[in-house]
């Protein structure tokens, strides 16, 4: 089962992601939502996600800082950085710390593909 944690400060984006992920027929299911990195870190142990969809720009901890913290506790946790602000430097840093995929927020098909691939691989 692809238990998914969504982390995004925009309520509309969390709703869109929830509908998209829960409508997938590949065993994906949203088990938690957080509005910032601090909430995600606190929530992770309660919902034990198989995969995390994480915004890059949020108040407080950035997506990369949040990913770094989550991966310190669980190095094999698949994280997808999903943002409108991904450039080569962000992508390189994400890769360096262990983020599995970086997907532009406009690329819904790419997000679904990444979630399917990462869920199948785990």
Predicted regions and their residues:
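Two-component/phosphorelay signaling modules centered on CheY-like receiver
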Residues: 11-32
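Short amphipathic alpha-helix used as the core "switch/output" element in two-component signaling
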Residues: 64-75
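Active-site beta3 strand of CheY-like receiver
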Residues: 47-53
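Acidic catalytic/metal-coordinating carboxylates
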Residues: 36-39, 62-65
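Receiver (REC) domain active-site loop signature in two-component systems and cognate sites
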Residues: 58
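Alpha4 helix (beta4-alpha4-beta5 surface) of REC/receiver domains from two-component response regulators
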Residues: 65, 85-104, 109-113
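Conserved sequence signature across two-component system core domains
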Residues: 7-8, 34, 52
């Amino acid at each position: 089962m692809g238990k998914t944690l969504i982390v995004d400060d925009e309520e509309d984006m969390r709703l869109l992601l929830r509908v998209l992920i829960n409508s997938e027929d590949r065993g994906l299911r949203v088990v938690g939502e957080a509005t910032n990195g601090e909430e995600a870190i606190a929530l992770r142990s309660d919902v034990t996600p198989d995969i995390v969809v994480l915004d890059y720009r949020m108040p407080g901890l950035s997506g990369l800082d949040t990913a770094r913290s989550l991966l310190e506790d669980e190095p094999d946790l698949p994280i997808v950085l999903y943002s409108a602000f991904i450039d080569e430097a962000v992508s390189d840093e994400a890769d360096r710390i262990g983020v599995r995929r970086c997907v532009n927020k406009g690329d819904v098909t790419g997000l679904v593909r990444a979630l399917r691939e990462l869920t199948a691989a785990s």
